[in-house]
Structure formats: structure tokens, C-alpha cells
């Protein structure tokens, strides 16, 4: 008897809700895991496959999938969910096939409302997923390792090719096409009450750069398809390993950017703040430096840091 061909639907809930300029990193990694296990990208009856659901699929179309992996980064998506998500969660049969996570599902909870438990559950959800644990990872074991899993940077290709004909600007979807994306560190010691890291105490090492750095060459131009790097690190400069990690980024000779910003206060507080500023200023940085200024009481620190930066 032929082995059943499993069909996977990947849902970027934020994309379906209001649109987003960035690909969903969790979905890119899940897609990469299926790719590494021989699944075909794009729906087919002839093989195990996975695809990004990019429109308001009707009820009958949703029946063809065995599992749905739904990621939601923003809480406003849960407040006003897209039709696909509403259908998946409200239908008794379909809801049993749904695995859903992301900061959007819990970020607004207070500690009293169970924020800590929800965050811990969410951070471990995929690595404890029963179905994913039937498939092999690149280390030879079973189950996805979100730290080391190489993303499938082509997951959004079909969506982008369609939408580029709609948007006036060719650059609108460049984040989907031109960047390697990941975290070198995760966490932060600031404990800001509005942040998903509000219970964390430090910045910890996460992925290696090689875990997400894409080296695919464009056959037409002979150049890198993704010549840029962007990083989602929460507070990179708070990591005790900021310097060797920064040196590694610089050594790639690729322009890079910290999309969540850098903690400028550390330029004034850290004993090597001037070295931080000097090294960043001399790096092949992409775009503007983004710095956090979330609390007016930090004004004096910010002023000191700006003087160092200048």
C-alpha cells in the first residue's frame, strides 16, 4: 500500500490580516524543515508537500490539508482575524489540524493573566510538536531545532511574484527577496513592561550566522540572491559576545542591519561603549542605525551615548 502523501498548509496570519513587509521567520524555518525532509514546495497530489496559504481559501479547499501551521506576530491580528484563521479555529474538524503560535497570541497578557506560562509554551511548541517529531533534523535526530534550522527563503516566492504586479514600488517586497534573516542572540535585561522580553534577564546566544546565512547564487547575474542580512535580535549589544559576533558579520562583507534597533544606552553604560560605537560606525551597515528611546527618564544616558556616537 502506497504511503500517504501528507499536505501541509502554512498560514502567515498577519499577512492575511493587514499585510506585512517582512516574511515570517518561524514559517520560513518550518518550511525549511519540510524541504529538508523531501517535501515539495507548492501543492501537488503526487508527493508530500507544503505551501503558503496566501488568499481567503474557501472551506472546501482547506479540507485538502492534513496539518496547518499558523504563525501570528501581532496582537491586532487576533483582535480582527482574517477569514481563513476564523474558519480554521471555528470548524471542529479543521481546528484539530491546527498548530498555532507566535507572540500575537499572548503578548498583551499580564503576568497575572498567565503571560509567563504562555510564552514558555509558545517558545517550545514547535520542538514538542508530535508530527514534526516524526521527521528528521539535520543532526540526525527527530524534531525541528528552531535555532539551527535553515529557512526556506523561497516560501513566499509565488505570493511576491503576484503582488509585485499590484504594488507600485519594486522595493516593497525586497525584504522577502534580498535578505538572510535570523537571530544571533535572544533576550534582554531591561525588562520593559510593554515588551515580550519583560521577564527575561539577559541576552543569550541563539543561532549561528551559518544557520541562516543564504549563499544562493542568481544564475542570471552570477551574484548572491540575498546580498543583505537583517537581524531580529532583541538587544544585541547586551550580549557578552557582541564583539566576536559583530566581527563575524563584518567578515561576510555583506551589508547588515539590526531591525529591532540597538540599545544606545549601552554606549554610555558599557565599559567598552566607545569600542562598540567605533566598530559599528566602521561596519558595512545597511540603512539607518535604529536606536531605542523608550523611557524619558533615560534622557541623560541617551545624550551621553549620542556624544560618544558622534
Where are these regions (language model features)?
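Flexible, charged surface loops at secondary-structure boundaries
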Residues: 1-4, 59-66, 92-93, 175, ...
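Hydrophobic beta-strand segments of well-ordered beta-sheets in folded domains
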Residues: 4-9, 41, 65-70, 96-99, ...
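A short, structured N-terminal alpha-helical element that caps or precedes a catalytic domain
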Residues: 1-117
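Conserved SAM/AdoMet-binding glycine-rich loop
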Residues: 10, 213-310
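Canonical Radical SAM [4Fe-4S] cluster-binding loop centered on the CxxxCxxC motif
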Residues: 21-26, 36-37, 174-219
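Short, solvent-exposed loop/turn segments at secondary-structure junctions
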Residues: 14-16, 48-49, 73-77, 104-107, ...
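Catalytic core of nucleotide-activated saccharide and alditol-phosphate transferases
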Residues: 92-184, 193-196
Amino acid at each position: 500500500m502506497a504511503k500517504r502523501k501528507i499536505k501541509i498548509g502554512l498560514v502567515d496570519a498577519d499577512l492575511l490580516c493587514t499585510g506585512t513587509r517582512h516574511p515570517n521567520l518561524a514559517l520560513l524555518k518550518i518550511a525549511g524543515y519540510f524541504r529538508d525532509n523531501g517535501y515539495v514546495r507548492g501543492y501537488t497530489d503526487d508527493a508530500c508537500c507544503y505551501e503558503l496559504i496566501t488568499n481567503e481559501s474557501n472551506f472546501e479547499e482547506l479540507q485538502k490539508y492534513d496539518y496547518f501551521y499558523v504563525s501570528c506576530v501581532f496582537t491586532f491580528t487576533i483582535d480582527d482575524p482574517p477569514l481563513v484563521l476564523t474558519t480554521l479555529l471555528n470548524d471542529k474538524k479543521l481546528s484539530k489540524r491546527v498548530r498555532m503560535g507566535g507572540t500575537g497570541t499572548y503578548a498583551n497578557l499580564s503576568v497575572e493573566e498567565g503571560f509567563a506560562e504562555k510564552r514558555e509554551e509558545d517558545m517550545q511548541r514547535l520542538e514538542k510538536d508530535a508530527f514534526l517529531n516524526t521527521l528528521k533534523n539535520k543532526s540526525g535526530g527527530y524534531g525541528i531545532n528552531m535555532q539551527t534550522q535553515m529557512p526556506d527563503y523561497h516560501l513566499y516566492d509565488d505570493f511576491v511574484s503576484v503582488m509585485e504586479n499590484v504594488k507600485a514600488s519594486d522595493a516593497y517586497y525586497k525584504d522577502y527577496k534580498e535578505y538572510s534573516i535570523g537571530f544571533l542572540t535572544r533576550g534582554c535585561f531591561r525588562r520593559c513592561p510593554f515588551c515580550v522580553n519583560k521577564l527575561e534577564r539577559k541576552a543569550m546566544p541563539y543561532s549561528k550566522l551559518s544557520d541562516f546565512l543564504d549563499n544562493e547564487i542568481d544564475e542570471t547575474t552570477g551574484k548572491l540572491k540575498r546580498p543583505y542580512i537583517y537581524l531580529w535580535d532583541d538587544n544585541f549589544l547586551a550580549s557578552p559576545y557582541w564583539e566576536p559576533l559583530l566581527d563575524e558579520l563584518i567578515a561576510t562583507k555583506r551589508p547588515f542591519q539590526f531591525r529591532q534597533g540597538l540599545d544606545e544606552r549601552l554606549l554610555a553604560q558599557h565599559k567598552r561603549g566607545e569600542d562598540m560605537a567605533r566598530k559599528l560606525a566602521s561596519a558595512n551597515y545597511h540603512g539607518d542605525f535604529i536606536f531605542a528611546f523608550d523611557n524619558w527618564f533615560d534622557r541623560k544616558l541617551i545624550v551621553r551615548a549620542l556624544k560618544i556616537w558622534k
